[in-house]
């Protein structure tokens, strides 16, 4: 079964303590869409991720990690207009830096290449339904998936 996932990807910087109490962070791939696709691929499934990253070192690193983990990254979009989101986590603390970032700027015009007809399932996170271009992309993607019978 092939799955098309519309979701977010961000660089997650994890620490064992609260961010203000540590000097060391571990960089990981974060975001519901990225996590879902990585796990689905690890179980032997085919998962394509439709998301947008900044055309920056963080975005390129995350795309390379996703591809290495077996995720189909052919639908990833990159933009120079916004940076890749970053989230700091540690000791029951989450500090998201998502406002005005690439993931939320993904718009409906970027859905044209999404292969809804070739997918067995379409999944998304309700977190993408915030007031942003990403919300409009979700609404159009849901209509396209319904029309394709996905």
Please state what every model-predicted region is:
Residues 29-30, 104, 134-135:
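A conditional alpha-helix N-cap/helix-loop micro-motif detector
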Residues 46-126:
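Conserved N-terminal subdomain of the carbohydrate kinase-like
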Residues 1-2, 108-115, 137-147:
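Short amphipathic alpha-helices and their capping/turn segments at secondary-structure boundaries
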Residues 13, 104, 130-132:
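Short glycine-rich, flexible loops that bind phosphorylated cofactors or substrates
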Residues 1-72:
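Glycine-rich phosphate/adenosyl-contacting loop at the front of the ribokinase-like
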Residues 24, 86, 139-141:
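Residue-level signature of transmembrane alpha-helix interfaces in integral membrane proteins
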Residues 121-150:
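Conserved beta-alpha-beta core of the PfkB/ribokinase-like small-molecule kinase fold
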């Amino acid at each position: 079964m092939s799955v098309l996932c519309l979701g977010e990807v961000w660089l997650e910087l994890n620490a064992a303590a609260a961010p203000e109490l540590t000097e060391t962070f571990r960089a990981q791939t974060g975001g519901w869409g990225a996590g879902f696709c990585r796990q689905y691929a690890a179980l032997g499934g085919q998962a394509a991720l439709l998301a947008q990253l900044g055309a920056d070192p963080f975005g390129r690193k995350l795309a390379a990690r996703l591809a290495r983990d077996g995720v189909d990254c052919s639908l990833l979009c990159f933009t120079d207009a916004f940076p890749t989101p970053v989230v700091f986590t540690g000791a029951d603390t989450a500090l998201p830096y998502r406002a005005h970032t690439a993931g939320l700027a993904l718009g409906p015009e970027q859905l044209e290449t999404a292969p809804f007809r070739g997918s067995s399932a379409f999944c998304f996170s309700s977190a993408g339904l915030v007031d942003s271009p990403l919300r409009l992309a979700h609404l159009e993607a849901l209509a396209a998936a319904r029309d394709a019978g996905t």
